[in-house]
Amino acid sequence: MIKTKNLKKNYKSLQVLNGLDLNISKSEIVSIVGASGAGKTSLLQILGTLDKPSNKDCELIIDDIEVLGMSEKDLCNFRNTKIGFIFQFHQLLPEFTAIENVCLPAFIKKTNRIDVIKRANELLCYLNLEDKINNKPSELSGGEQQRVAVARALINNPQIIFADEPSGNLDTTSAENLYKLFFDIRDKYNTTFIIVTHNQKLADLADRKIEIIDGDIN
């Protein structure tokens, strides 16, 4: 599903990633851990095509496609079709309702409006938010807001979801429920998850845990 070879990243003189080789299988849930500044988020952003490696002699293959040579337009279309994102701060638009927030990526993709609304309703019901569909983010708890963000990440049927500290803003119970939800989604949709987290207990629940130390995989 995802393969990297000799992936490097530096910010001026600071080397963040030191030539990483990585293989992630379809439907695998992988956690990425490490100290602050170790390179976790930099790796996640490159894998998610939000950033590019610093070196040219590297590979990033997603779903058998080498993505580093894509034009910006093709890469944007690829990202919107294949990939979903979940962040610590859900980034829901406050002026829109839950279902409107969920629908946005599919509207950008120009999917049929009726089909989008139907799927958004199905996802919100699946995530036990059927009675919150028309609520705005300010009317939802932190855990509910994050579940809306999960539904938004799923709206385009992505093969891969990248999550950057998705439970960092949640209490312990909500965080554990969120991780259980990831496994349920994987089992239902065969989705691959790559999760950056500081929470070692939750990281240990993943199929595989990758530790980044000073830009290298331990």
Q: What are these regions, as identified by a protein language model?
A:
Residues 56-66:
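Conserved ABC transporter NBD signature motif
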Residues 155-159:
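A short, proline-enriched helix->beta-strand linker immediately N-terminal to the Walker B motif
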Residues 48:
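Helix-to-loop junction immediately C-terminal to a conserved catalytic motif
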Residues 136-146:
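Conserved ABC ATPase signature
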Residues 96-105:
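Short coil-to-helix segment of the ABC ATPase nucleotide-binding domain corresponding to the Q-loop/switch region
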Residues 161-164:
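Catalytic Walker B motif of ABC-type/P-loop ATPase nucleotide-binding domains
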